Amino acid sequence: MTTPNKTPPGADPKQLERTGTVREIGSQAVWSLSSCKPGFGVDQLRDDNLETYWQSDGSQPHLVNIQFRRKTTVKTLCIYADYKSDESYTPSKISVRVGNNFHNLQEIRQLELVEPSGWIHVPLTDNHKKPTRTFMIQIAVLANHQNGRDTHMRQIKIYTPVEESSIGKFPRCTTIDFMMYRSIR
């Protein structure tokens, strides 16, 4: 059992993007849900609006499946939950699994959440802080607060590390001979 990274209350994952070290890749994936109430599905989970949410409609575990077309490097998963708004619909126990497909998923994190309010940052790295490479991520809601049946998740974001480019890493021309040939006429 692990606890999610401690971040300042309500820390916006877009701050991660602004650092230039990660980018959001959720739009590159195919999303599916184990169940949802009409009008409370994937579109609401991905619309960048903290007032909308996915609401499950069935028995637990409630699943969010995120499938990539090719093996993808993932570093951080961010989930927005709000106990004050959702009460018994708020997840209290979440399992994060990765794999090539539904048949070989392995749990890499299990989280215990106590009345969460804001963004929950879940590192998808190994013991050496190396990001995970996977075709699929599954988020399973195993339990809710107050033994609630259905769940609400307001937003989910997935981040990959930004790879450094070799452009601009060449040494500068410093001698007169090199400077003569540094531009093309």
UniProtKB/Swiss-Prot annotation:
Record-linked PROSITE patterns: DOC
Entry-annotated residues carrying N6-acetyllysine: K169
Any single Gene Ontology cellular-component annotation: nucleoplasm
Domain (DOC) spans 2-185
The record's InterPro entries line, in alphabetical order, gives:
APC10/Doc1, APC_su10/DOC_dom, Galactose-bd-like_sf
Name of one Pfam family that matches: ANAPC10
- SMART domains the UniProt entry points to: APC10
Q: Does the keyword Lipid biosynthesis apply?
A: no
Give the record's family classification. Belongs to the APC10 family.
What protein name applies here? Anaphase-promoting complex subunit 10
Q: What organism is listed for this UniProt entry? A: Homo sapiens (Human)
